[in-house]
């Protein structure tokens, strides 16, 4: 009579693509938390360490823009600032599954999940180079960190394809993605070019879908 058990979890990998929309939350434009108005896309890789968690790496590129004239805030409408910026980010962290999601098991499988870690990004600095009466100017490069806070839902579409939808906010350590705090660019205070709320940093949000392909080691069995 033979007995057998699985003595290790299938440490399977995933690679794929993410696409969706981005929006900015700061001192220029609308203040909606989730309102995608520009594109974002890139690559995602995961190393599933157990049915409940995975190491995750993503490389994403996005455009962000904001326009005071589209804001519901009368003061911003009267001010009339606007900008366009780009963000290239690398993010590394842990993805936690609410329910067990074992890629070695048969379908159907699905679970909500959370992701967080550390993000390093590149964007343009902006500032009111020609004074408050003029618009924001892109000048210089802003390298900084952010904390990603992501909620999503994923499902095994086939034995080797995983589909997911997610919303992820990035709290940045910068207050100058919108040009409101040019000290980060100039290394000096410039009161005539400062505006907005100094007590809050900038955020950006990615909303989209991903499709990943799985591969890797199946469970080992003892007889």
Where are these regions (language model features)?
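Residues that define the transmembrane beta-barrel architecture of outer-membrane proteins
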Residues: 11, 35-39, 86-90, 110, ...
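Flexible, surface-exposed loop regions and adjacent strand-edge segments
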Residues: 32-36, 71-78, 130-135, 180-189
